[in-house]
Structure formats: C-alpha cells, structure tokens
A protein has these predicted regions:
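Short acidic alpha-helix initiation/capping motifs at coil-to-helix transition points
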Residues: 76-84
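Alpha-helical oligomerization segments
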Residues: 110-120, 128-188
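N-terminal accessory interaction module
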Residues: 1-63, 155-181
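Short, surface-exposed acidic
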Residues: 90-105
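Short alpha-helix boundary/capping elements
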Residues: 59, 92-93, 108-116
Length: 188
C-alpha cells in the first residue's frame, strides 16, 4: 500500500480555466514534463494556467488545480504507471514502450514523494519558468481551519462572511433605511 495524489474538484472553476479539466478522482502527477519542449510565450492562456498551477490527471489527461492524498494499492499504482506510459508514447512521442515505462515510473515515484502527508491532505502546485527555461515547482498543502470551538461546526467552513460585533456598537439593528434621503445627500 502506498499513497498517491488523486484529482479533486471543490468547485467548477477547473472547467473554465483549463483547456481540458481532469475529472475528480483521477490519479495525478505533477505533469510539468508536458511543457518542457514548449515556449511559454507561445502557450494559450489556458495552457499557461495549466503550466502555472495544474496537476495532470491520468485518465482524461486534463488538468486539476488541486489533488488530495489518498491510499493506493500496488495494483492501482501499477495502473497509474501504465496509463502515464501510454500518454508519454501517444502524446509526447516516447521512442519506445520501455523508455515510456521508465519515465512513467519516475513520475509516479515523484508523485508518491508528494504524498508523505496524512491521507485527505490537499495539495496545490505553483510553477514558474526561470529565465534559463527551467521550470521551478513549489508544492503546498491546504488544511481546513480549526472550527472545533465553533457553535455550528458542521457549517462553519461554508460561511462566506462572518459577522462580528464590535465593542461599543449598538446591538440593535437598524429597522429602516431612508434611501431618498441618502440619494439627496451631497456627494462632493
């Protein structure tokens, strides 16, 4: 048993920002190799987004902004290597199946190394292209905020805004707003 990254979609934004979005639940690799022989200035906007912040899904060969660390069996790992080897042959012209398998094994081993975190840890990547053309990757983990003291922990992470009472402010709500008076005020 090992751990590998699996694509996750928290909202539909990946379907808008990438040319091809990975489906949730695909095994994933960093995927930076997909840009090694490409001039960044020649990439489309969506391709640049994938270069900057995408993980490559191994079923659709689409991109995902986030991955989650999950356990994987030896068979699932071998399947991921096979899927990636096919992609390396078909899309990137690996000269032989043997070389494609070696490169795929190396990529999957790197993906495993990213998963030294607890299961369910969310991973994100940020890439920059150096002046030399080298791609620099930085990986980070995202964690849920501790809401253990929240009176409504089930919905605590769903709030877009939190209302906080400030000391010295009236707790009584304003019942009426006079919009006509507001419109007549001098705005200079």
């Amino acid at each position: 048993m090992t751990k590998l990254p699996r694509t996750i979609r928290l909202d539909p934004s990946d379907t808008f920002i990438f040319e091809q979005a990975a489906e949730p639940g695909e095994w994933a690799v960093s995927g930076s190799f997909a840009f090694l022989d490409r001039e960044p200035s020649m990439l489309t906007r969506k391709e640049r987004t994938a270069l900057r912040s995408g993980f490559l899904g191994l079923r659709s060969y689409g991109w995902s902004t986030l991955c989650v660390v999950v356990e994987a069996s030896d068979e699932e790992r071998a399947e991921a290597v096979d899927q990636l080897a096919v992609y390396l042959r078909e899309a990137h012209g690996a000269p032989s199946q043997e070389l494609a398998m070696m490169a795929a094994e190396e990529e999957i081993a790197f993906a495993e190394s990213l998963c030294q975190h607890p299961v369910q840890t969310i991973l994100a990547v940020q890439r920059d292209v150096e002046e030399t053309g080298e791609i620099r990757e930085r990986f980070r983990t995202l964690h849920a905020r501790d809401r253990s003291g929240d009176p409504d922990p089930l919905h605590a992470n769903l709030r877009a805004f939190t209302i906080v009472e400030k000391a010295g402010e009236s707790a009584d709500p304003i019942d009426e707003v006079d919009l006509q008076a507001f419109l007549k005020t001098d705005k200079t």
